[in-house]
Amino acid sequence: MAVCARLLEWIFFFYFFSHIPITLLVDLQAVLPPSLYPQELLDLMKWYTVAFKDHLMANPPPWFKSFVYCEAILQLPFFPVAAYAFFKGGCKWIRIPAIVYSAHVATTVIAIIGHILFGEFPKSDVIAPLTQKDRLTLVSIYAPYLLVPVLLLLTMLFSPRYRQEEKRKRK
């Protein structure tokens, strides 16, 4: 059981550690001026949006931008803290912040995936997932950002490794 718990902690560590450059170099391109990024990163984003038909990153609507602002303001500062906690392992103090984080992220990614699967996209949009295959391919890009937070939430809620033991007062 301890090996399984430690494996999960390593998964969470790599998730949070890798999320720092992904957020800074990729995700924030949706809200920051292009002048802040080198041309190679702008070209990479253009290739990605065309190849995977990600209209949310190509032409982000206001609701999606609000999610990216939350990622920048609320989540990004949490990434190194969480990476440290899971690298170290067994840090009970990460439980409540991880529950808040995972519930928040799962909620936003469910909205994104729902939009991708069920949204109506005008045929005039050059970049949009118009076929079922396009939609499922794009969902597969976003899915890990739902699955790992849900796994984190379940771990924090049900793993005895992270439960705080209550101190009872003697009478």
Curated annotation (Swiss-Prot):
Topological relation to the membrane, as annotated: Multi-pass membrane protein
Site residues by UniProt (Likely important for receptor folding): D54
Annotated TM spans: 7-27, 67-87, 98-118, 138-158
Gene Ontology MF terms in the entry: cholesterol binding; oxysterol binding
Protein's cellular compartments: Rough endoplasmic reticulum membrane; Nucleus membrane
Residues covered by the EXPERA domain: 8-153
UniProt: cholesterol binding residues: I73, Q75
Record keywords: Endoplasmic reticulum, Membrane, Nucleus, Transmembrane, Transmembrane helix
Summary of the function given for this chain in its UniProt record: Sigma-2 receptor which contributes to ameliorate dysfunctional cellular processes and slow degenerative progression by regulating cell functions including cholesterol biosynthesis/trafficking, membrane trafficking, autophagy, lipid membrane-bound protein trafficking, and receptor stabilization at the cell surface. Forms a ternary complex with PGRMC1 receptor and low density lipoprotein receptor/LDLR at the plasma membrane, which increases LDLR-mediated LDL cholesterol internalization.
Domain remarks: The EXPERA domain doesn't possess any sterol isomerase catalytic activity.
Family: Belongs to the TMEM97/sigma-2 receptor family.
Name by which UniProt lists this protein: Sigma intracellular receptor 2
Native organism: Xenopus tropicalis (Western clawed frog)
